[in-house]
Curated annotation (Swiss-Prot):
It is found in: Cytoplasm. This is Protein sip-5. It comes from Neurospora crassa (strain ATCC 24698 / 74-OR23-1A / CBS 708.71 / DSM 1257 / FGSC 987). Keywords: Cytoplasm. Residues 7-16, 36-48, 62-81, 545-572, 648-657, 783-799 have a biased composition (Basic and acidic residues). InterPro entries: Sip5/DA2. Belongs to the SIP5 family. Residues 49-61, 209-230, 384-394, 476-504, 586-604, 621-645, 688-697 have a biased composition (Low complexity). Its main location: cytoplasm.
Length: 857
């Protein structure tokens, strides 16, 4: 189409360039030969430019070209596209001025600005054959009330004049003047050109249905001897033979194009008015065209040629999302090859999109030449004037206003033009894409194969260091895998076994018949061994990760448990503090008998109901019975569900050291502590020196101290009277008061011997002088009962509430006051082996006691 002129000019330029190069080469060769002859006598090196046939000044030009920057591929492609665009614009302008088909054009009008990748030569041939509508000029606006000059201006792309304005001369068509019959006869003699015995193509035979309109008018104003004016693309089509395969014969060339006489009228109307007076709109681009448009073969919908040539097959792609249950499914799709489906109709989406065209009832512009045989078989020739006055049309052409067809046409119909016909290179593109994909797959396979082979060779080299070499014998070759298995051990050695088996097969084949295993089998074995190795490695990695996760979870659970225990201890301490009141706030969680009234002076907490010396004497005298009961409590385990007395019900101060959460083995196992001097001032009055436990501690006999190993001895004293008021529930040593001590202070055996009281056996707590005096003991018990009723408030329980698991006998002993109760009225008993200096310090001696005023806290 438009590339013919460019190719011709390019050919001329190449011819000139070849001539100049030949002349330059000749001049250069002659000059160089002179130089060579002049230099032969000097025995110098021949100039290489003479051997290469270069000119004298060519060296400098090529030296300059070396320093020029090379053009990249992108720049070269952009330059090529720009050249094609400029050439296309020039060709469009030339074709629109010189060529047309029935008032339409053979080049696009610029509706779509994208690349024109359709075959322009095929489209040109189809339009000249009247199988495809020409590229009509589309109108953006059209008014049915336009006058003829306005329609002509719009069809030619000129400014539309006003309705009442006088149109310019160029918009007024002028009929041709009648010519002489001699001119007509002379033109008739030159109608045909000898074709040389070749047969016309089928397309050309179909295009001669209206042969009468192809005759030149007698009034032709051309001065040429022949009415036929060959176009520039005719020679190219004849030489290249591009239409040979498309016309059904491999030996034919494209038919010769001829230009019909220029007649600006059709049935007495201007050509533009005849075309655009009944204009229609394209449903795709929404431009107004003449009613002679293409119609789809399936649904008979109008479509312009510019929209039709833009519809094409999709690019080659993988068959994803296609209907696999379709019985017409292509087997190539199941093979995973690239596919390219035919284009579908834009209206009804039916595949194999194609169009048909019904040309207008006249012929103007280009057409193909006809043979004399075809011309003789047609009817008598009609002139253009007779065709203007004639109301009958050619028999083979249907009127566009006729009845529309109500059924679709086959894709193989002769008058159907498919999208694949204007783009015949789709099959080539598909094959190229498949070949490119195959090359990429082959390259990837080669890379993977090389990687597997390298890994396999390295693994075999490593195994050969530890195994026995194969010397070629079948016995040694068969013995090698066994040795290798023994060296490898009992681990998962399946990949090594596979490699050893392959090695054995190769050795046996090379020593025997020389048959080797195929490359595909080796590759499969290597892939199998690699897969097993990767699987084992993945399993080991998974186990390591699982072990790490388990360790993390265990540490996390341990931390959470410790936090929960600390929170529970804090909550229990807070609850005990709230339940016991202000006197319970400083108590330790390890409460025991050390919180009894014996430890009140040292611990500095609790309530003391009796402040008199008599109450102190009672407490001091009841030590023996308390020790006996403590020993029983140590041997008998405490009940786990022992309940402490409620502080709300017993609010008289008798349950000083009883807490709800103090049921522990440590509390029951500890002996009763002895009192110590108070750490600070107290509101209580000073106790008597005769009844004070502190004075006994100062003047106790030498050697009465019991080491820590005798702490659990019921005959020894308990813990020190130093309070554990500041000790936390967990019993940390750092929270303990350093002024206090847990070492025993007294030996109650030596104290009892000095005092004269028995602390063992059935008569524990009795004086030695009163053991045989039953009456005096009974009388002492009566007095104790009477004094217990009156002064019961001064008796403090020694055992804690956690010793609820003690037997009934021990509980009865603990609930009753001791058998020997020393009161203010009891007479002092003299002991013979006791010095007078220490009599005043022992229990039972007369002592002047100052009665202190009782203070209630």
């Amino acid at each position: 189409m438009g590339n013919a002129n460019t190719k011709e000019s390019r050919g001329d330029d190449s011819g000139r360039r070849g001539l100049h190069s030949a002349l330059d080469a000749g001049i250069g060769s002659s000059t160089q030969s002179g130089r060579e002859s002049s230099r032969r006598n000097r025995n110098t090196r021949h100039d290489l430019t003479g051997l290469l046939g270069r000119a004298a000044g060519g060296s400098s030009s090529h030296a300059d070209e070396r320093h020029e920057r090379k053009e990249t591929k992108q720049e070269r492609e952009a330059r090529r596209l720009e050249k094609e665009r400029v050439a296309r614009l020039q060709e469009r302008e030339r074709s629109m001025k010189e060529e047309h088909v029935d008032g339409g054009y053979l080049v696009t009008m610029g509706t779509y600005v994208g690349p024109e990748d359709f075959n322009k030569q095929i489209v040109r041939q189809l339009m000249i054959e009247r199988k495809l509508a020409p590229f009509w000029r589309g109108l953006n606006d059209f008014d049915e009330n336009w006058t003829e000059p306005q329609i002509i201006a719009a069809a030619r792309g000129l400014p539309i004049p006003a309705a009442g304005e006088t149109p310019p001369d160029e918009l007024i068509p002028r009929p041709r003047s009648p010519a002489s019959p001699t001119d007509a006869s002379s033109n008739t003699n030159h109608l045909t050109v000898p074709i040389g015995g070749r047969s016309l193509s089928t397309a050309s035979e179909h295009s001669t249905s209206n042969a009468g309109s192809a005759l030149p008018s007698p009034g032709s104003g051309k001065g040429s001897s022949s009415p036929f004016k060959p176009t520039r693309g005719k020679a190219i089509a004849a030489v290249l033979g591009g239409g040979s395969c498309r016309n059904g014969s491999s030996t034919e060339i494209a038919p010769r194009e001829i230009m019909l006489p220029n007649d600006p009228f059709v049935n007495g109307q201007p050509l533009e008015v005849f075309l655009y007076k009944n204009a229609t709109e394209c449903p795709i681009c929404f431009l107004t065209y003449p009613p002679y448009l293409n119609h789809t073969r399936c649904c008979d919908q109008p479509i312009c040629s510019e929209c039709f040539v833009q519809i094409k097959r999709p690019d080659p792609h993988f068959p994803e999302g296609h209907n696999e249950n379709d019985p017409n499914n292509n087997p190539e799709e199941s093979a995973g090859l690239l596919v390219s489906e035919p284009a579908c109709c834009p209206y009804c989406t039916q595949p194999d999109f194609g169009v048909t065209y019904e040309p207008p009832p006249f012929r103007r512009g280009l057409t193909y030449a006809i043979s004399p045989l075809a011309l003789g078989s047609t009817s008598a020739a009609m002139s253009s004037e007779s065709s203007v006055n004639s109301g009958s049309l050619s028999p083979g052409v249907a009127s566009p206003g006729g009845r529309r067809r109500n059924q679709s046409l086959s894709a193989n119909a002769p008058n159907v033009v498919l999208t694949d016909k204007v783009r015949p290179e789709w099959a080539t593109k598909l094959q190229a894409a498949r070949a490119h994909l195959a090359r990429r797959a082959a390259a990837a396979t080669a890379l993977h194969t090389a990687a597997f082979l390298m890994n396999n060779n390295e693994s075999r080299a490593l195994r050969s260091r530890f195994g026995r070499r194969n010397t070629g014998g079948s016995g040694s070759a068969s013995a090698t895998p066994g040795n290798g298995d023994e060296n490898r051990g009992t681990g998962p050695a399946t990949p090594a076994n596979a490699g050893a088996t392959a090695n054995t097969d190769r050795a046996a084949g090379s020593s025997g018949n020389g048959n080797r295993r195929s490359r595909l089998e080796d590759l499969e074995e290597m892939m199998f061994a690699e897969a097993i190795r990767l699987s084992l490695a993945a399993e080991e990695e998974r186990k390591k990760k699982a072990e790490k996760e388990e360790q993390k979870e265990a540490k996390k659970r341990e931390k959470e448990r410790e936090k929960a225990e600390k929170k529970a201890e804090k909550a229990a301490a807070k609850a005990a503090a709230k339940q016991g009141g202000p006197y319970e706030a400083s108590r330790s969680g390890h409460s025991s008998a050390s919180g009894s009234s014996l430890s009140l002076p040292g611990l500095s907490f609790g309530r003391k109901r009796g402040n008199s010396a008599a109450s102190n004497l009672r407490v001091e005298a009841s030590v023996a019975s308390a020790m006996a009961s403590t020993g029983a409590a140590m041997t008998t385990p405490a009940a786990p569900g022992a309940l402490a007395p409620d502080s709300s019900t017993k609010d008289k101060g008798k349950a000083v050291d009883r807490s709800a959460g103090a049921a522990s083995n440590d509390a029951s196992a500890r002996p009763i502590p002895s009192p110590q001097p108070m750490a600070g001032p107290s509101h209580l009055r000073q106790m008597s020196s005769a009844s004070s436990a502190s004075s006994s501690a100062v003047e106790s006999n030498q050697g009465s101290y019991v080491p820590p190993s005798n702490l659990q001895d019921p005959r020894g004293s308990g813990l020190s009277l130093g309070g554990r008021s500041g000790v936390s529930e967990d019993g940390d040593e750092q929270d303990r008061d350093p002024s206090t001590s847990t070492e025993p202070m007294f030996n109650f055996r030596s104290l009892a011997e000095v005092v004269g009281v028995s602390i063992e056996g059935e008569h524990a707590g009795k004086r030695l002088s009163q053991i045989n005096a039953d009456g005096q003991a009974i009388e002492g018990e009566d007095e104790t009962a009477k004094s217990g009723e009156g002064a019961g408030e001064h008796v403090e329980h020694v055992l804690d509430s956690q010793t609820t698991g003690i037997s009934e006998q021990d509980s009865e002993i603990n609930s009753q006051p001791p058998r020997l109760t020393v009161t203010l009225d009891s007479p002092a008993t003299s002991v013979g082996d006791v010095s007078t200096a220490s009599d005043s310090k022992h229990v039972g001696n007369e002592t002047t006691v100052e009665h202190a005023t009782q203070v209630t806290l």
